[in-house]
Amino acid sequence: MATPVESGTVPCSLEPFDVYLFGRGEHWDIYRVLGAHAHAQDGETGYRFAVWAPNAHAVSLVGPFNDWRSGDFPLFPVGTSGIWAGFVAGMEYGRLYKFAVQGADGTVRLKTDPYALYCEMRPGTASFTWSLDSYAWNDAAWMQRRREAGPPLQQPVSIYELHAGSWMRRHGEGHPFVNWDELAGTLIPYVRDAGFTHIELMPVAEHPLDQSWGYQTGAYYAPTSRFGTPDDLRRFVDLCHQQGIGVILDWVPAHFPKDDWSLGRFDGTALYEHLDPRLGEHPDWGTYVFNYGRHEVRNFLFANALYWFKEFHVDGLRIDAVASMLYLDYSRKEGEWLPNVHGGNENLEAIDFLRELNRVVHEQYPGVMMIAEESTSWPGVSRPLYTGGLGFTFKWNMGWMHDTLNYMRQDPVFRAYQHSSLTFSMLYAFSENFVLPLSHDEVVHGKGALLSKMPGDMWQQQANLRLMYAYMWAHPGKKLLFMGGEIGQWNEWSESREPDWCLREFPAHEGIRNLVRDLNGIYAQEPAMHRHDHDWSGFRWLDFSDYGCSVISFARFAEDSPPVMWVFNFTPVVRRWYRVPCPRAGEWQEVLNTDSGYYGGSNVGNGGGAVACTDNWHGGHFMELTLPPLAAVALKPV
């Protein structure tokens, strides 16, 4: 048992302006006011504890220091703010605690601090007294470049999505997770070598259940203890920045779990959520939905988003399940939802919350990314606020993902009849600032790995995967690939095991990784491949109509930079003397061929290049190519 803290609690004051801003929902550093913080009072040092529980009958501090007995260390109301606070002299750094909240219903619940900075390892749910002020950053050059560059709409963004708990694991008995330092030593060189510009971490805030992958967050301000301390995560981000790699976090403001120790019914009432389950509960996930109309709840979430940018220097947040926030009838049958004041299904409070969130984030941290996982056709998700948009930097292109995977699943014999699945995305490619995602959602729950979705024998499956990756990297939009996809993983992902890294011993699988590296290289090095990812000036169809041969071709453009021309053959038939329109006459170099033996292909190609001639009849230019089977060819002018 820990040494008792003899003094108990005494009242302490909070700055009136802090309380005022919190009541308005506009205190961006509220996590430095509420929660547990080192404090000096009346000549003594210790910790100040503060928690918002406006409907509670009583709140006290419990922990090993008082054998978890409620009532021994009472907190005191701070005026009429709904905040309870108290000072404990002699309380030290690194001590476990919880709040014992006697709710409006008379029940005493032991609650995790909503503003906890660090928590114990699951299944424990207590918080530690902690500090935010001990880490010295070494990424000033990166942060300055990010500020000066602004949002990366015209920059290459290629994201490697990963689950920190399964990218690398300890084997044998005991704790299965590696810490952030161990992960950094292996992951950062790997990602850098593969040419990705950013890492996206699935949620790293504390969560009780491994199988939730972090999407049911229990403590929003506490990096999970599975991988080390908050400073360990800071060091991981710092090291990424020093190696030129950005870090994006998945963030979950759409819902939270019903666990009794967490935010739900925090003071015996529906405090963070709506009371009516038609508004306050999510039927798919069995979770609570935040009350976005309550100032203090909005403040909790606004400040949390800013917290990751300010205290952890992250470069972006990917907001999960945005569609579930926008629609009151999301995944609900008639009678299971309530319309808004205008009779519609739009969640007006959530819409206002998202718009204000993006305004504040971009105002406070220019150059960072706010990315929406939004699966419907809601207009203007990534359009500016002044045009009526939601203000996100990017939106996941779920339509492109579904159509592409649907097309690639087809036997090549039948692809001619699905040709529109391949070309339809260009009708809306510039309606939003899109990220093309091949994410974790596509390789779990019986969906199979990307490679296993491909038709044909083993060679054809691998060729199809290489072809799909080339199509993805050539298509307008930023890129996202989930871990394991770069080596042609056969098994679908599980949070309890690593990718099958042994596959890298096989040339065909290492060839897929080589291709991803080279695709990232072309994407980053050729301005035509990324500068106009979000407008028509960077794209031109050469031929989209040859559905009979399942061949398409297009070119990418940027001012003061040579174009890059792409030709795709979605059948296993080698097509010789295939005539393709091209942007200009002269010599063209073959800069990438997914059928190269280096990638695991059959080495059918064009001898390193081709010559484009002028078509005197039509006044354009063309070249005749040999199209490899199930392959893509990229060319640029010499």
Swiss-Prot record:
Keyword Cell inner membrane attached: no
Any GO MF annotation of the entry: 1,4-alpha-glucan branching enzyme activity
A GO cellular-component term linked to this record: cytosol
Reactions listed under catalytic activity: Transfers a segment of a (1->4)-alpha-D-glucan chain to a primary hydroxy group in a similar glucan chain
PANTHER family: 1,4-ALPHA-GLUCAN-BRANCHING ENZYME (PTHR43651:SF3)
Functional note: Catalyzes the formation of the alpha-1,6-glucosidic linkages in glycogen by scission of a 1,4-alpha-linked oligosaccharide from growing alpha-1,4-glucan chains and the subsequent attachment of the oligosaccharide to the alpha-1,6 position.
Family: Belongs to the glycosyl hydrolase 13 family. GlgB subfamily.
UniProt protein name: 1,4-alpha-glucan branching enzyme GlgB
